[in-house]
């Protein structure tokens, strides 16, 4: 080391030999004392070097004699000056980074891990998946440090930080204001040395700079190419260039600011510490004057956005070959007036002398204009969430500008327009935050030159609108949130925005004194608004200009017509309305875009003329002298009651409608009647409709709810009479409320092909809750049967309908009904639950696995640290951002979903359990068993879900049983470790579902389903079931004839002679039609079975609706069986209510009302609120 300090070049040969000697001794650094390295103070060295540069040349460098010098300083003073001028352009921040890297490189020679001592590890961490890769802490990108684990480097890491995150280096060194912009290329070339000595024969400094500059990409190239991923080719190429630069600079000289750089660091790191040189001004393709009107798209650097029309244009397909021809063409075609005005009719202005700049995305927090800067070779990447709203940019500018700034005028001019976000105040270059100094705007190159152009963006209408975040061609109103189109691409404006203000928000237009003023009363928008208001038949109101020159215009909206006091929009079809007086549905037109109110007025004139007369008389009634009507309220176009402070009378249509809606809310949400006395609810009503008076709670409990209950009950009775074939099926069960009270429920199911009360839809299944009654805890089957028979008598048999099949999940109810005269079947979903629950309990290993999964999920739910770690691992491994599911042990479906979620998050669960020190760890064998359990339970969960839909029928049970049996057989070969569970599944299915395969009700339903027919039976079974179906059809026909004959006999008893005569002629009729009637049922069944089987997605009820005319008897028989649901689950879903209020059920009166509230809660949506 000491020998190296004494070495100095004497001539060319000696210099080369000395350099080789330096290289050899550099590898053997055992002689370097570690204590001296730790005490190195690079800041003091920097200050000493600065003093040396200002005071004079260092002694001993100009001669040829040998003296003791620091390593690396072996050039003449002229060479030092030449390269001192070159390296003086570097910022102090980059110098600090370079010196810190040198320090870490020297310290790495000690017996410690070298990879953790590089300054790059302040910004990176080692990838947990691959130790040869590192991950950036800011953008979470992964970079390779080399292929061989013994030869890794951090060159690419520091290169990424300098290119993609330069602000981090600025903040890290604490000298933000010292960072200077890179000078022009002409200033970078050092002056030709006066006496270069023999070194000029090796390589001149100018040639060196030119050669280095040719190897380094331009700032434009750096901006365009992606820096997120560094390929191996780029790394190798950068290393080769760096090595060349290191050799040439070693031959020529070194900077006085980097005394030990060539000695202590490898040559490849030298190039990383140096900055690339920009191209010349004439060669930059981004310095066209057209960039005054465009800025780079934040999503795609190959596209530019026009600041005038916000349209996006491509600058070329190849990211390395971009141009501005299309931008110039767009300006000349779409904005020719701006170009001519800007250049006095000469076309596009000449090129900039320097590249255009951008406004800084993040201004310094202290408000100092010169506190932030960036080198042009380290462009500050534009933030994706950069302000695009009209307010945000100007607020940032004004908050950071000093009052004395010369540019405050321009920024203030821009702050008057909230639409400045359209332009984004951007240029194609990446943002350079050199404060808001005159250099930032290139002596006003952007704002000063474009001041006239940007005046068009100062429309005052942007005080009330903001650009839509999802579509730049639309603007959002700040008052109503409506998204309004500003035009098509290439032709946008603010006319539609002003029109919206005049029509929807006239009070805003008139309330702002400085907004548009009275001078715009003669504008086209004012004329249009006034013409529209005068052309309205129901609101013939003139435009008013107040004495404060505030223009007020009437609101022209579909909701301002007085007719809307008597109608409400139908919830099922927005093109129809419902009359509040008679409940009739009236169409407003066929096209949703062209709806009117003429039909509504005709309906009132035809059926409710007295309402119009009453309204006219109320309007004509003079108001008291003390009552003052606001001018703006008169112009709002609302009803006469909205124009005054008078309260609605009780029979007013609006008051009746509001009261009805409040009663609906009480029923739908199971609210107590005292809810109407709540202060917040009353304040809301007072604000929304001050004219409305809220009735007392007793009105709702004694009048509104009982009246609504009676109306809904009558409507359901009328719907039941429309049932096809006159058969009603039922689902019944015991429902337990949240207060542990048990209720017996009865829900009706029927098929209706044509119902005027229901909107047209493909679903012909109808259902309604008939009754709810509380039962004692020690109820018996006989008491339940008596209660059901009472309900059937009240709802079904009294109206001439027939009681069909009853589906229940209660074994006691089913047994009692089967022993009597009623038909009952078990719920399919409940049977599947019993089968799966028994199978899970049959194997101890499966139970232990479920217990382990529950503990893990419970621990994660209770531990915030585990939740946070799980979310972090999900992001790291790109797993779905899902929470773990905690199951309910009594419901196997929740356990299945819990295991599925654990398998989905398997990788994260394993790592989280280790890092959070969980006692419960899932082994590999347990993961395999868990997957087998999920594979076994999945078909049963799918079957239960399929059979629980609103459109499922009894005909799907036999096909589903065959599918599950086949699936269980296959699971023996596909799974491992759960054979006991699979055998239990198979045995339980045989014991609980085998009888279903031969039940006549299920067999007839399957035969009459055009999707299955006899395809699931053997030939012998199919032939037998076909004959049974024919006999069932004949029996139904004979029963219907007897019923028809009894009705005819009840009409009146004729005389004996006439009766005998009728009997004679009836005998003749029977003789004529004897043979055909005997063959009719068989012919229908054979013709039906000969047709092809339909796809599974087809609706069988729609099929029988089409065949109703061809096979009326067979269609009626099919509806009898296909109208029955296979599961009680759809009915149970109707009772998913919020937590009941404690006041309900405390007395017998409240319990009766609770049953009525449940009845209304379930049935109001089923009848589409038409009552």
From Swiss-Prot:
Coiled coil segments of this chain: none
Binding annotation for Zn(2+) 2: 306, 309, 330, 335
Residues given in the record as Zn(2+) 1 binding sites: 136, 139, 160, 165
Pfam family, one: zf-BED
BED-type zinc-finger residues: 115-172, 285-342, 456-512, 558-615
Residues with PTM Phosphoserine: 624
Tissue: Expressed in testis, heart, lung, and weakly expressed in brain, liver, muscle, placenta and small intestine. Expressed in the retina, found in the cone photoreceptors, Mueller cells, cone pedicles and in the innermost retinal layer.
Main localization category: nucleus
Region (Required for homodimerization and nuclear accumulation): 1086-1171
Cross-link (Glycyl lysine isopeptide (Lys-Gly) (interchain with G-Cter in SUMO2)): 43, 489
InterPro entries linked to this entry: HATC_C_dom, RNaseH-like_sf, Znf_BED, ZnF_BED_domain_contain, Znf_C2H2_sf
PANTHER family noted in UniProt: ZINC FINGER BED DOMAIN-CONTAINING PROTEIN 4
Role of this protein: Transcriptional regulator that binds to poly-guanine tracts in gene promoters and activates transcription. Able to bind single- and double-stranded DNA and RNA.
Subunit structure: Homodimer; via C-terminus. Interacts with MYH9. Interacts with SAFB/SAFB1.
Protein name: Zinc finger BED domain-containing protein 4
Protein's organism: Homo sapiens
Upper taxonomic lineage: Eukaryota, Metazoa, Chordata, Craniata, Vertebrata
Gene that this polypeptide is encoded by: ZBED4
């Amino acid at each position: 080391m000491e020998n190296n300090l004494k070495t100095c070049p004497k001539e060319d040969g000696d210099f080369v030999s000395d350099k080789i000697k330096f290289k050899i001794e550099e590898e053997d650094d055992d002689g370097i004392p570690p204590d001296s390295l730790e005490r190195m103070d690079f800041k003091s060295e920097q200050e000493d070097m600065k003093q040396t540069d200002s005071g004079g040349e260092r002694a001993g460098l100009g001669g040829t004699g040998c003296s003791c010098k620091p390593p690396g300083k072996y050039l003449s003073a002229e060479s030092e000056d030449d390269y001192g001028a070159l390296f003086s352009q570097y910022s102090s921040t980059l110098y600090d980074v370079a010196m810190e890297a040198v320090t870490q490189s020297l310290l790495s020679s000690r017996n410690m891990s070298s990879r953790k001592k590089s300054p790059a590890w302040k910004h990176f961490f080692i990838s947990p998946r691959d130790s040869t890769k590192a991950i950036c802490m800011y953008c979470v990108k992964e970079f390779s440090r080399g292929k061989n684990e013994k030869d890794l480097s951090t060159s690419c890491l520091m290169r990424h930080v300098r290119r993609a995150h330069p602000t981090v280096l600025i903040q890290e060194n604490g000298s933000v204001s010292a960072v200077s912009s890179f000078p022009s290329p002409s200033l970078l070339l050092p002056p030709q040395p006066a006496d270069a000595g023999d070194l000029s024969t090796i390589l001149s400094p100018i040639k060196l700079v030119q050669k280095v500059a040719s190897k380094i990409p331009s700032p434009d190239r750096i901006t365009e190419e992606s820096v997120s991923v560094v390929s191996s080719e780029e790394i190798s190429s950068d290393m080769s260039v760096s090595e060349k630069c290191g050799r040439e600079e070693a031959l020529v000289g070194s900077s006085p600011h980097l005394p030990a750089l060539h000695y202590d660091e490898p040559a490849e790191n030298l190039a990383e510490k140096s900055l690339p040189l920009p191209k010349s001004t004439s060669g930059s393709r981004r310095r066209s004057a057209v960039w005054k009107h465009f800025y780079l798209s934040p999503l795609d650097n190959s596209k530019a956005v026009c600041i005038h029309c916000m349209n996006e244009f491509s600058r070329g397909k190849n990211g390395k070959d971009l141009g501005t021809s299309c931008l110039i063409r767009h300006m000349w075609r779409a904005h020719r007036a701006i170009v001519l005005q800007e250049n006095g009719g000469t076309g596009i202005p000449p090129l900039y002398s320097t590249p255009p700049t951008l406004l800084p995305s993040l201004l310094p927090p202290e408000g100092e204009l010169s506190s932030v800067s960036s080198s042009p070779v380290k462009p500050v990447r534009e933030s994706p969430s950069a302000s695009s709203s009209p307010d945000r940019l100007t607020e940032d500018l004004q908050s950071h500008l000093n009052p004395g700034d010369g540019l405050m005028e321009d920024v203030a001019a821009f702050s008057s327009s909230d639409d400045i976000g359209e332009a984004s105040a951007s240029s194609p270059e990446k943002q350079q935050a050199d404060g808001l100094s005159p250099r930032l705007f290139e002596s006003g190159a952007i704002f000063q030159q474009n001041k006239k152009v940007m005046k068009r963006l100062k429309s005052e209408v942007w005080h009330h609108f903001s650009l839509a975040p999802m579509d730049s061609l639309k603007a959002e109103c700040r008052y109503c949130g409506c998204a309004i189109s500003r035009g098509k691409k290439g032709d946008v404006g603010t006319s539609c925005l002003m029109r919206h203000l005049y029509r929807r928000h006239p009070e805003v237009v008139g309330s702002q004194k400085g907004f548009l003023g009275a001078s715009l009363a003669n504008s086209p928008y004012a004329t249009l608004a006034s013409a529209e208001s005068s052309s309205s038949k129901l609101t013939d109101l003139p435009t008013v200009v107040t004495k404060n020159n505030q223009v007020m215009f009437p609101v022209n909206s579909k909701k301002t017509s007085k007719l809307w006091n008597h109608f409400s929009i139908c919830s099922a079809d927005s093109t129809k309305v419902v009359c509040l007086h008679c409940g009739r549905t009236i169409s407003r037109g066929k096209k949703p875009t062209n709806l009117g109110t003429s039909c509504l007025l005709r309906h009132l004139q035809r059926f409710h003329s007295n309402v119009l007369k009453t309204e006219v008389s109320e309007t004509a009634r003079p108001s008291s002298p003390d009552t003052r009507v606001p001018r703006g309220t008169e112009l709002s176009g609302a009803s006469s009651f909205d124009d005054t402070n008078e309260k609605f009378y009780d029979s007013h249509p609006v008051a009746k409608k509001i009261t009805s809606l409040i009663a609906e809310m009480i029923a739908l949400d199971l609210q107590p009647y005292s809810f109407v006395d709540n202060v917040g609810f009353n304040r809301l009503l007072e604000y929304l409709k001050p004219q409305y008076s809220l009735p007392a709670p007793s009105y709702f409990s004694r009048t509104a709810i009982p009246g609504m209950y009676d109306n809904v009950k009558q409507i359901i009775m009328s719907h039941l009479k429309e049932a096809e074939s006159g058969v009603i099926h039922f689902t019944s069960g015991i429902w337990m409320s949240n207060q542990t009270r048990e209720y017996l429920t009865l829900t009706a199911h029927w098929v209706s092909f044509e119902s005027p009360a229901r909107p047209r839809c493909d679903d012909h299944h109808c259902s309604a809750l008939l009754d709810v009654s509380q039962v004692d805890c020690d109820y018996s089957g006989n008491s339940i049967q008596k209660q059901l028979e009472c309900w059937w008598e009240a709802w079904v048999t009294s109206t001439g309908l027939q009681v069909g099949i009853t589906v229940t999940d209660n074994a006691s109810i089913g047994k009692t009904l089967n022993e009597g005269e009623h038909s009952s079947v078990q719920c399919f979903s409940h049977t599947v639950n019993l089968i799966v629950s028994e199978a899970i309990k049959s194997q101890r290993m499966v139970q232990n696995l479920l217990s382990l999964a529950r503990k893990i999920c419970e621990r994660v739910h209770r531990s915030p640290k585990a939740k946070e770690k799980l979310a972090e691992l999900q992001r790291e491994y790109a797993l779905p951002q899902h929470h773990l599911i905690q199951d309910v042990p009594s419901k196997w479906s929740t356990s299945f979903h819990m295991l599925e979620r654990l398998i989905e998050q398997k990788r994260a669960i394993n790592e989280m359990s280790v890092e959070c020190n969980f006692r419960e760890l899932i082994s590999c064998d347990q993961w395999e068993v868990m997957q087998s359990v999920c594979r076994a339970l999945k078909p049963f969960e799918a079957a239960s879900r399929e059979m629980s839909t609103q459109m499922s029928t009894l005909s799907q049970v036999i096909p589903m049983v065959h599918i599950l049996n086949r699936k269980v057989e296959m699971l023996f070969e596909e799974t491992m470790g759960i054979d006991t569970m699979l055998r239990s599944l198979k045995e339980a299915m045989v014991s609980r579902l085998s009888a279903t395969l031969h039940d006549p009700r299920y067999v007839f339903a399957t035969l009459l389903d055009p999707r299955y027919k006899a395809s699931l039976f053997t030939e012998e079974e199919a032939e037998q079931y076909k004959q049974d179906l024919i006999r069932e059809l004949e029996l139904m026909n004979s029963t219907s004839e007897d019923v028809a004959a009894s009705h005819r006999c009840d009409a009146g008893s004729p005389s004996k002679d006439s009766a005998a005569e009728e009997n004679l002629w009836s005998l003749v009729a029977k003789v004529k039609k004897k043979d055909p009637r005997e063959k009719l049922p068989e012919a229908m069944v054979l013709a039906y079975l000969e047709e092809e089987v339909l796809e599974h997605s087809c609706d069988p009820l729609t099929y029988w609706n089409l065949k109703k005319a061809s096979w009326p008897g067979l269609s009626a028989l099919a509806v009898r069986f296909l109208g029955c649901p296979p599961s009680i689950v759809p009915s149970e879903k109707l009772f998913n209510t919020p937590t009941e209020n404690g006041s309900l059920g405390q007395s017998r009166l409240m319990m009766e009302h609770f049953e009525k509230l449940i009845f209304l809660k379930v049935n109001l949506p089923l009848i589409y609120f038409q009552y």
